[in-house]
């Protein structure tokens, strides 16, 4: 019983409200539906949610404890890319969903310091998205774009 209580109290509490709102996507969505804006802030270490994602990529950066965006996928997507555009600032991404244990993390995209995640098998459900920076408390305006392939 003590082990169960310890596990429950050690698990980070993830909020169901997002700093910049919720957006829903279905197949063949138009680019405007998959484009949202926000800004980074906070000194919450994203590695507190998970040190590594499902592909063993490091989860790094600092953000607000609440997710920045909640994305609801109304259908399964075989392939998607989620890209941050902060005009070249050093950003990171952490996406949790559709369950509590599926984590995807992203950092630099090619020569760009902005983060992206390109992955397969996005299941129908709710995804919590954090956009972070390497420096705690850094405020960077960004556009987040979701593209289906």
Locations of the language-model features?
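Cleavable N-terminal signal peptides
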Residues: 2-3, 13
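Sec/Tat signal peptide C-region and signal peptidase I cleavage site
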Residues: 9-16
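C-terminal edge strands of extracellular/lumenal beta-sandwich accessory domains
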Residues: 16-56, 65-69, 124-149
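Extracellular beta-rich ligand/substrate-recognition surface
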Residues: 56-66, 107-110
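Extracellular and analogous surface-interaction loops
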Residues: 63, 67-78, 118-123
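Hydrophobic beta-strand segments within beta-rich accessory/binding domains
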Residues: 70-86, 93-94, 127-131
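Solvent-exposed coil/turn segments that connect beta secondary-structure elements
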Residues: 76, 87-89, 96-100, 134, ...
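Noncatalytic accessory or regulatory domains flanking protease catalytic cores in secreted, cell-surface
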Residues: 94-145
